[in-house]
Amino acid sequence: NLNNSKFKQLYEELPTPNVYRTASGAPGHEYYQQKADYEINVELDEEKNILKGNEIITYTNNSPDVLNYLWIQLDQNVRAKNSHGQLTSTNSMNNKMSFRNIKRMHDRMDFDGGFKLEEVKDTYNNDLSYVINETMMRIELPKSLRKGQSFSFKIKYSYNINDRMKIGGRSGYEYFEKEGNAIYTIAQFFPRMAVYNEVEGWQNKQFLGRGEFTLPFGDYKVNITVPSDHIVAATGELKNASSVLNKNQIKRWEKAKKNFIDPVIIVSQEEAKENEKEKSKLKKTWTFEAKNVRDFGWASSRKFIWDAMAVDISGKTVMAYSYYPKEGNPLWEQYSTRVVAHTLKVYSEYTIDYIYPQATSVHAKSIGMEYPMICFNFGRPESDGTYSKRTKYGMIGVIIHEVGHNFFPMIINSDERQWTWMDEGLNTFVQYITEQEFERNYPSRRGPPNNIVEYMKGDKSGISPIMTNSESILQFGNNAYGKPATALNILRETVMGRELFDYSFKTYSERWAFKHPTPADFFRTMEDASAVDLDWFWRGWFYTNDHVDISLDKVNWFKINTGNPEIENTISKNQEENKKRYIGISRNKSSIKKTITEIDDQSIDFYTTYDPFKTNILDEEDYNKYIKNLDEDEKEILKSEKNYYELNFSNIGGLVMPIILEFTFVDLTTEVVRIPAEIWKKNSNQIKKVFILDKEIVKVQLDPFLETADVNLNNNSWPARNEPTRFQIYKGKDRNNENPMQRAIRAEEKSNE
């Protein structure tokens, strides 16, 4: 027979431990990783929306392997005409199509995207042989690169910057037609090294647009040349502030470095408005440096307002920055930098102390995207300055999420191209904690188990396991963000408990900070640091698309038969009398005038008048003999008057989970009982469990605190009860689209009339 147990260990699913990655989930004694250092010069041509650049990459081979070629990522090529990313993306036509959708299809087809490479040379200006395969480029090395050796080479390139509002994308620009200005959010803007390790060899899986990035750590020096009236935000630290900022701005910046309470405005809204009026033809070069980062991103605009505040992380000062246009106010000035600071503090508590010198939030319509020390975030009020609740909390949530990505995957550097959940899921989990610490009862979208129920009970043909490659995931947001975040919340609150979970999660973060973890490293560390066997949990939640639906089928109530004829005969007599409540018996009293035994004495015998519930001397003697043969413990049990309740459960959804029960007693007091998931170890389909209780129960509730993501609450109660589905009744169409702030303003104006 095959072992199909849901508690089967994950020996077959997880890779064999080795000198690079241990069975405990920690890096092995021969763990290594490569290094890629960059010197980059880029210039923004605002008129033509072209970015021109050149770079020197120094690649260091720390592996024990000899390398004969290098793989470089050309992510911009995903936007090249007829790229695999475009050809493999699916779309469809309907009987009605909006102009916007049709125009976007045309714009994507017509856009001349992708890197234009002018030269690929070594540092002695010798041409290097290379082959481009879609979003990957293989460079042939002049000679083999052995362990500990480095190789430097140069690439000169350019590409057309995409209009994000027309064709989408993680980076690009947003054009403000009324004033003729733009906000540039620039990333994947330079050819980048692929990762080489003992897990994948070269991770050169093509970039098709969804599965994000797998990148080695390195040091960056980046010179960014833009129009002189632009303000630039970027990964790393600004090294030439005196060349690009005026004296007042530098003075405000220095003030912000000492202000830990409120943000300080460095570039004001009035200054940004002045910058917007005229497009300078002059250029300025901003120089940034970053140490031990895996990537680099930047943003540039003359529209930017800039504010900042200091954050204390374990005695070290870290700067929180926000860059946003006037269109972002009042939301951004009030919240963005404060949210950045809050996020750094909470994530540092639950993972590792934030190690970088700054974290930046940049306003960018319609996207949320992350890079080391910088992220691009949506959240724009209405033109009148009001905003909906959804806009406010959506903005705060996306800032927390994208700033949180500094930890996952920028520091704890997982393979996004392979496993989206390892950064998005873990990040969304800590995002939930951060949101709840920002505001009590914060309306978090993801994290609470009941929020994932609709997804998990859906059609299984449209649901893939969490352990699915990024490009093949179905229902991307629920699969890679919502479900893993929910799973970790359930581990923390229900399976492991906060103390064990938090220690283990922090251990994983510390072990794999500035390294490249895999799913096995995470799974093994969580068990290693807690002494909790979680293989059943990983198997069910991460390797299947099963859901939670545990049914409380039946509750049977038992009482001990004392053997005492005086007691038991009375009970039996009452039970027999209850049977006579049958309506036919009561009607027979009037419809049957006389029975045969009432008419004819000859039809009467012993049993006609025999009372089986009358105690006689023999019954008493039998009872006394029975009692005499009992020891004291047995006599106590006999006298205890305990209630024995046998509960029957079925596992309908397939996921084995802990059983949480709330008993309500006849005196309306309650008791909660928590049973580990291992109760299903012998039979994962149906189980019975007996509970010995002092008081009678009137109600049993399964999963009373909605902590297991059970998809069907209608089979969770005894006595059974249905949860009502509420419906809304309306008259005609509600055409009022104002947000609550607009309505409040209108109400105030009306009351003042």
Each PLM stretch: what is its role?
Residues 55-57, 61, 74-76, 149-163, ...:
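Short, hydrophobic/aromatic-enriched beta-strand segments in well-ordered soluble domains
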Residues 1-73:
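Early extracytoplasmic/domain-onset interaction patches
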Residues 71-125, 225, 229-230, 664-674, ...:
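Solvent-exposed beta-hairpin/edge-strand motifs
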Residues 82-97, 158-220, 241, 310, ...:
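Glycine/proline-rich low-complexity spacer/linker segments in large multi-domain proteins
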Residues 191-202, 208-400, 429:
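Hydrophobic helix-coil surface modules that form long, contiguous segments used
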Residues 5-23, 36, 288, 320-627, ...:
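Hydrophobic alpha-helical and helix-loop surface patches within well-folded domains
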Residues 50, 60, 66-67, 97-176, ...:
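A surface-exposed beta-strand-loop module
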Residues 207-210, 231, 238-249, 254-259, ...:
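Non-catalytic accessory/interaction domains
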